[in-house]
Amino acid sequence: MGAREVDLKNFFKGAATALVTPFDGREVNYAVLEKLIARQIKAGIGALAVLGTTGEAATVTNKERREIFAFCVRIRNKYDETRRTKLIFGCGANDTREAVKNTEIAAKLGADGVLCITPYCNKCTQRGLYEYYREICRATALPVIAYNVPSRTGVNILPETMEAIAELKNIAGIKDAGGNMAQTLETLRRIRRQCDLYSGADELNLPVLLCGGAGVISVTANAAPSSVRALCEAVTTGDIARAIQINELLAPLNSALFCEVNPIPVKAAMNLLGFFCGKPRAPLTEIENEHFKMLSSALTEFRAAMKNEAFFKD
């Protein structure tokens, strides 16, 4: 599998947001997308994961994908001239050739890195997973983050497979949204010398960080970017009591944002916050009324609880 040619272990640390994609009817709402990006940059988020699961990548056309990528680069550069906020573009597919093509487009348009979900529906073997990431890495010099979310894809990157994937020359890490803490710990044990692990399950952000995770790629950070950033910073600075306090304040909101399949609740939350992201594209539906009431209550209570926090700007 060869030695690593570059050290990408420090590609980014801390808080990243799995950004929603706002729609206005059938079209991407670029005016709102600009507001979302500007807000995240102002909140000090370290990276934006664009067109992942939360961004409804499965329902955008190839033309839209290119346009969204190009737009995000332009708007990031407008509000962040230093380019401190990394842009990580979702490029995974259930066809290796398509994933490679998406990655090449992302690189051409100015991505800082790519996030590649495992192939879905095909249910490939562990060897197939390794070869999938190998081909993506061969096609680009960009940092590549593997993305494991077996509940949505039907395949699971086992720790020993991720250990092999971590040896590929430009693997920067893995977004672990498996929800299995035992597997997360074993994966961390196997890869920590080679690359990073990022929490992809908001309810597990704190334990993953405390056990050596490099950061989070968060759905909740759409609604509460400064709070998620503060959680990560508290762990980094060793203020564990503070981290626990912030996590306890975030916990009810985390739960509410997953009362239905992602991104149905988070898009409803963004609408409530005044960022009119529209409804998810079919076959996803609008949030059920009872869940909407629960989400609205959780969001109101969270903002009330956080209003006296110095960092709170959400």
State each model region's role.
Residues E34-I37, P159, F292-L299:
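Short, amphipathic alpha-helical "lid/cap" segments that border enzyme active or binding sites
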Residues R4-T17, T21-G154:
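Active-site beta->alpha loop and helix N-cap motifs at the rims of alpha/beta catalytic domains
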Residues D7-F11, R83, E186-T187, C195, ...:
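Catalytic cores of TIM-barrel enzymes
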Residues L33, R65, F69, A99, ...:
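A general structural signal for well-ordered alpha-helical segments in protein cores
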Residues N148, N170-I171, R281-A282:
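Glycine-rich phosphate-binding "P-loop"
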